[in-house]
Amino acid sequence: MLPSQSPAIFTVSRLNQTVRLLLEHEMGQVWISGEISNFTQPASGHWYFTLKDDTAQVRCAMFRNSNRRVTFRPQHGQQVLVRANITLYEPRGDYQIIVESMQPAGEGLLQQKYEQLKAKLQAEGLFELQYKKSLPSPAHCVGVITSKTGAALHDILHVLKRRDPSLPVIIYSTAVQGDDAPGQIVRAIELANKRNECDVLIVGRGGGSLEDLWSFNDERVARAIFASRIPIVSAVGHETDVTIADFVADLRAPTPSAAAEVVSRNQQELLRQVQSTRQRLEMAMDYYLANRTRRFTQIHHRLQQQHPQLRLARQQTMLERLQKRMSFALENQLKRAGQQQQRLTRQLVQQNPQSRIHRAQTRIQQLEYRLAETLRAQLSATRERFGNAVTHLEAVSPLSTLARGYSVTSAADGAVLKQVKQVKVGETLTTRLGDGVVISEVSAVTKTRKSRKKTSNP
């Protein structure tokens, strides 16, 4: 045999590694049911046990971070359902499974299916409140979908008869347990909607195990309840039993009897309400009649009081009383008017204007004399002050100085000449005398030794 045709040779380590990879990649995660044996829990908190059936067994490990989510304590001999990964422990070549989750077998498997369907329908929105239909109030006809031989129907009919015997009830008999039950329940719901005889439906059964109630966890039943045009009250099992039908139904009743309570009226309570209403109406009528009678008596009395003869007599009496009051008032008014006239006459005499006018004229004459004297004195003093001022002005006036033989010479720009250096030859000068003005032209300028004002000859 050529070397190229020789079989592959594995080491033990490589063999175990290859087998482990094949198991993990090919098998992946699986569900396994079996009986627990050799269960141990060391200080690490991990679980080690064996799963077996009648002919085989396999070693299992469930690590602490996974087993703390298990809600029960595994027992020797207990049947369980586990979700696990298949692997191989390479150092010893031991084939084993690593458990991720564990639950009791039987009902545990059903519970798993229940949770999966619940999550699916919830994700689709079948449990949303916006899709819940209101129950009729009051209901005029009730449909019951349940077994005709079950205790649930007996309880429902008993409650309805006690509370509202006149309420019509239509029974849609169906199986509530077994493989055929979901299909029969769906057909009963569809039939009730097709006939449209009822305005509310009760769908339910009595209590039982999870397996007994499983028909109401069927997806077909849930979708039929959701699609029903007639409002549905679910009444499955006892108060602690919760099914998928309860989540989808428009209302969940804890028991069938409670469902009957919900959809019916309490006739005895209605009778009590009618009697109470009747009593209130009778009391209201009695009050109304008494009030009307009292009103009639008042009106009758008023009519008697307003008889024409009585009114005429009252008017006559009132007229006489008013006449007396008017006469007395006129006398008092005339008396007060006379007294007022006398008082005004006395005041007029006391306040005669002639004397007041005479006193005013005398006062005016006195004031005129005093005013004239004051004006004359002020005028004389003013004239004297004016004369003194004129005399003083004449004494200091430049014109008086000119009249005494002096003169004032100014240049062409009007500046008064005080020194010869202000004058230039050929310049025109103006000289003011006491009786006039002389205009001359400078032909020569001579400065004297003494600082005297130089005069120029024209």
From Swiss-Prot:
Catalytic activity: Exonucleolytic cleavage in either 5'- to 3'- or 3'- to 5'-direction to yield nucleoside 5'-phosphates
EC numbers: 3.1.11.6
GO BP annotations listed: DNA catabolic process
Short name of one Pfam family: tRNA_anti_2
GO molecular function, one term: nucleic acid binding
Described function: Bidirectionally degrades single-stranded DNA into large acid-insoluble oligonucleotides, which are then degraded further into small acid-soluble oligonucleotides.
UniProt-recorded name of the protein: Exodeoxyribonuclease 7 large subunit
Naturally occurring in which organism (per UniProt): Escherichia coli O6:H1 (strain CFT073 / ATCC 700928 / UPEC)
